[in-house]
């Protein structure tokens, strides 16, 4: 889990005059807002650890002195493919094996520190497969299940984007109640830089946008994602199930962390890596150098597309829930909202 540069999580207001900025999909962003202080007393510095395995050396992300052994093992499993139960982790010179028997042990209680290189080996004394028995009584072997990238369903309550972003950047915390504060934070950032966040960017005046985004019946999109990418200092990748493409916010900003969302035309869900061991928490934060997870995300989107699990925003049928007028597509809904001020739509 990690917080934004210059501070922690939502719950404080950025200092006046903090720089704004927004990127379009696949475009870079500027540095994030400054002057934000940590919330809840979080002062744990992030650790920089490297792990050396058979296939090469990797940087481990999002760890601190309070990270549990099970979380460390989960990240190593995602990188190396070695399940937590088969891992041997050595450190120091001569290398000594870490005690991994208690998954709740925190890293500061182990003989390691930030900057260390961890040597990861597969324990050859443990079977790579699980024995099973055929009807003839002879043992057969089932191949070990690998971690799977999956969609985490969040409520379809007009705030799915905010709930999804919060889930991934907080390391798997589902908290729909986060949305109002995130909306207010975004409004503050936009209001602080009216020159950049102009009507040409926002599609409405700066003041109108700030009032609009704070309402709980409005949807977030590219502008809000770009602001959150800078605030959390991470690349936010949105995989589209209709076009099977990935829009990468903060791609050129040099962030070391990456999180993923999936979008079906009207709804966002977070993506996380789920491990076979139910005691291993899902992984939501990835290295920005890990392109394998992007391939997995595209495969997930393509699978959803083949099952028609998307909404064509240019052709779907809507009804205005205020005046009951029938509308087709996002453009008609947008025009209707401008003409009437009605913004509560339902899909027919």
UniProtKB/Swiss-Prot annotation:
UniProt-annotated binding residues for substrate: 266
Listed EC numbers: 3.4.19.12
Domain-level remarks: The UBAX-like region mediates the interaction with VCP. The C2H2-type zinc finger mediates specificity for 'Lys-27'-, 'Lys-29'- and 'Lys-33'-linked polyubiquitin chains but not for 'Lys-11'-linked ubiquitin chains. Selectivity for 'Lys-11'-linked ubiquitin chains is provided by recognition of the sequence surrounding 'Lys-11' in ubiquitin. The S2 site region provides specificity for longer 'Lys-11'-linked ubiquitin chains.
GO cellular component assignments: cytoplasm
Main location: cytoplasm
Keywords: Cytoplasm, Hydrolase, Metal-binding, Protease, Thiol protease, Ubl conjugation pathway, Unfolded protein response, Zinc, Zinc-finger
A family per Pfam: zf-C2H2_OTU1_C
InterPro entries: OTU1_Ubl, OTU_dom, Papain-like_cys_pep_sf, Ubiquitin-like_domsf, Znf_C2H2_type
Keyword set includes Metal-binding: yes
Biological processes per GO annotation: endoplasmic reticulum unfolded protein response; ERAD pathway; macroautophagy; protein K11-linked deubiquitination; protein K27-linked deubiquitination; protein K29-linked deubiquitination; protein K33-linked deubiquitination; protein K48-linked deubiquitination
Reaction catalyzed: Thiol-dependent hydrolysis of ester, thioester, amide, peptide and isopeptide bonds formed by the C-terminal Gly of ubiquitin (a 76-residue protein attached to proteins as an intracellular targeting signal)
Name recorded for this polypeptide: Ubiquitin thioesterase OTU1
UniProt function note: Hydrolase that can remove conjugated ubiquitin from proteins and participates in endoplasmic reticulum-associated degradation (ERAD) for misfolded lumenal proteins. May act by triming the ubiquitin chain on the associated substrate to facilitate their threading through the VCP/p97 pore. Ubiquitin moieties on substrates may present a steric impediment to the threading process when the substrate is transferred to the VCP pore and threaded through VCP's axial channel. Mediates deubiquitination of 'Lys-27'-, 'Lys-29'- and 'Lys-33'-linked polyubiquitin chains.
Zinc finger (C2H2-type): 318-342
Disulfide cysteine pairs (residue numbers): none
Organism annotation: Bos taurus (Bovine)
Gene (name only): YOD1
Lineage: superkingdom: Eukaryota
Transmembrane segments: none
